[in-house]
C-alpha cells in the first residue's frame, strides 16, 4: 500500500527505509518459522500419505521462499526502484509458495486430479494432527463429499484416521 500511496503523498518515500527494515526483520523470522514448520509437517504428512495410498506414493512438501532469509535485505534493496515503479514489493514472505511432490513429481503441474485430492487430504489430516498436538484439543473437520472421490482402501484409512474427530 505504501508503494501505491507514495505517488499521492510523496512525503511517504522517506519512510520506506523504516518499513523495509521492519519487513526484512520480521520476514526473516517468518521464513525461518515456515522452514521449521514444513520440516515438522513433512515428518507427519509423509507417514499419513504413505498409509493413505497403500504405500504407493511418497509425498513431500517443499517450502519455496521468494528469496533466502539471509538474502532478504539485499534483495529488497536491489529491487526497490523496480518495486516503486511497479507499486509492489516483489520479495518477502508474502511471495513465498509451497510445492507438493509425489514420488519426486510436482503435483501442481503434473499430478493427476486424484493425486492432488489425496495430497490435499493428507495435508488436512496432518494439520489436524498438528493442531491437536499443539492446542491439546480436537478440532472439527469439515469434509464435503470426500468419500465419493476415494477408492475403498483410502476410504477405510480416512475413516480410521478420523474416528475420534468431530466431522461435519
Q: Where in the sequence are the language-model features?
A:
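Conserved NTPase motor "head" modules and their coupling/switch loops across ABC/AAA+ ATPases, GTPases
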Residues: 9-140, 149-153, 157-160, 164-166
Amino acid at each position: 500500500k505504501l508503494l501505491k500511496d507514495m505517488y499521492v503523498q510523496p512525503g511517504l518515500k522517506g519512510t520506506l527505509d523504516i518499513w523495509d527494515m521492519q519487513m526484512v526483520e520480521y520476514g526473516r523470522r517468518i521464513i525461518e518459522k515456515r522452514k521449521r514448520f514444513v520440516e515438522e509437517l513433512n515428518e507427519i504428512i509423509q507417514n499419513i500419505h504413505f498409509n493413505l495410498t497403500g504405500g504407493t506414493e511418497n509425498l513431500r512438501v517443499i517450502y519455496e521462499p521468494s528469496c533466502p532469509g539471509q538474502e532478504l535485505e539485499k534483495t529488497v534493496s536491489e529491487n526497490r526502484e523496480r518495486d516503486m515503479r511497479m507499486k509492489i514489493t516483489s520479495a518477502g514472505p508474502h511471495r513465498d509458495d509451497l510445492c507438493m511432490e509425489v514420488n519426486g513429481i510436482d503435483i501442481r503441474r503434473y499430478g493427476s486430479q486424484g493425486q492432488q485430492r489425496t495430497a490435499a487430504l493428507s495435508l488436512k489430516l496432518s494439520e489436524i494432527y498438528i493442531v491437536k498436538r499443539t492446542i491439546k484439543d480436537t478440532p472439527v473437520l469439515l469434509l464435503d463429499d470426500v468419500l465419493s472421490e476415494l477408492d475403498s482402501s483410502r476410504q477405510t484409512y480416512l475413516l480410521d484416521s478420523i474416528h475420534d474427530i468431530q466431522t461435519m
